[in-house]
């Protein structure tokens, strides 16, 4: 059985597509690594790339991406709405299949040490890979951002890195590497440019200040769109789903005469999270994920993916036809028609 992990490196560049292309090219050139998604945001001046593959291959891709970011990004000239301490700011490893969170911790520690060895970029470990309890939360590591950390590392032992010298790389800063469960980056945009309203809402909904469990949030100003945004990380969407967070943001916004005008998901999201949201807002009675066509087809195909790399289903035709021919109620005529049409 293949061992699969995900890595979601965040880079402090969201305005120069050529630089992001070069970073992605460095990572995608590693055999066995798949670039599943890339997001750029000019206001945040940040890119989020989603990689998946076998652990060693993904680790090497993350290392090469860090090296290319070090070449191309100068934090002394960087501005953006999102907090950052490094050119290759954050690199979490997430278990997918045949891999435990402990495996990802070991991989994160290995990658962190190798980043220092290759590039002389100091390393902080966070989440499950944290070496100190106060560094479990990323916001504690990023406090003061690049500029503040640059000064504090020289004189404050509590702000010194887990790996490397107590001195930031002059242009690439530091990198924060960790291991965690799947996280949903979910942002809600408001019909106001008043950042203080977004900050108040963020404070009300985040767990650290008495809000919803498994929620981290902050207010962000989107100058290019003349909007304020509540930027949210959901660390356990099954316990605190997206729809619950959206409804609380909406309720809190009403207190200040504001309202959501849209929301966005940054990166990838589990299908189950969207099913839960649809179930809630449509008020479906006795809904089961088995009613979703793609879920039923995947079951019939023995868990095979719904699409090949080229987006076609041709490679799955034989097991599907065998399932249709079997003496069972599903998949039925409607499913067969849908498959044929594809």
Show which residues each predicted segment covers.
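Glycine/serine-rich anion-binding loops at beta->alpha junctions
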Residues: 325-342
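Long, contiguous binding/interaction regions
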Residues: 1-322, 326-327
């Amino acid at each position: 059985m293949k061992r699969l992990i995900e890595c979601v490196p965040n880079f402090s560049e969201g305005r120069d597509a050529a630089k992001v292309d070069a970073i992605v090219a460095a990572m995608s050139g590693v055999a066995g690594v798949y670039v599943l998604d890339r997001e750029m945001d000019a206001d945040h001046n940040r890119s989020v790339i989603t990689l998946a593959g076998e652990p060693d291959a993904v680790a090497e891709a993350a290392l090469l991406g860090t090296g290319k970011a070090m070449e191309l990004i100068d934090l002394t000239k960087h501005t953006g709405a999102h907090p950052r301490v490094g050119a290759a700011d954050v690199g979490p490893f997430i278990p997918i299949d045949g891999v435990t969170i402990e495996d990802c911790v070991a991989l994160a520690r290995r990658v962190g040490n190798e980043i220092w060895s290759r590039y002389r970029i100091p390393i902080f470990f966070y989440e499950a890979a944290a070496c100190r309890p106060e560094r479990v939360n990323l916001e504690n590591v990023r406090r003061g951002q690049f500029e503040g950390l640059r000064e504090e590392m020289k004189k404050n032992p509590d702000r010194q890195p887990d790996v490397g010298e107590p001195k930031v790389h002059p242009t690439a800063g530091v990198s924060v590497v960790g291991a965690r469960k799947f996280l949903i980056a979910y942002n809600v945009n408001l019909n106001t440019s008043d950042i203080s309203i977004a900050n108040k809402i963020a404070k009300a909904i985040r767990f650290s200040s008495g809000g919803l469990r498994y929620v981290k949030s902050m207010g962000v100003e989107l100058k290019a769109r003349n909007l304020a945004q509540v930027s949210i990380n959901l660390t356990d969407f099954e316990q605190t789903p997206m729809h619950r967070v959206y409804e609380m943001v909406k309720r809190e916004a009403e207190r200040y005469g504001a309202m959501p005008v849209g929301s966005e998901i940054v990166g990838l999201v589990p299908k189950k999270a969207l099913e839960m949201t649809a179930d809630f807002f449509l008020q479906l009675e006795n809904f089961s994920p088995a009613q979703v066509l793609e879920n039923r087809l995947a079951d019939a195909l023995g868990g095979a993916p719904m699409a090949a790399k080229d987006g076609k289903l041709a490679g799955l035709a034989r097991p599907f036809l065998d399932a249709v021919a079997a003496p069972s109620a599903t998949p039925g005529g409607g499913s067969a028609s849908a498959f044929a049409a594809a």
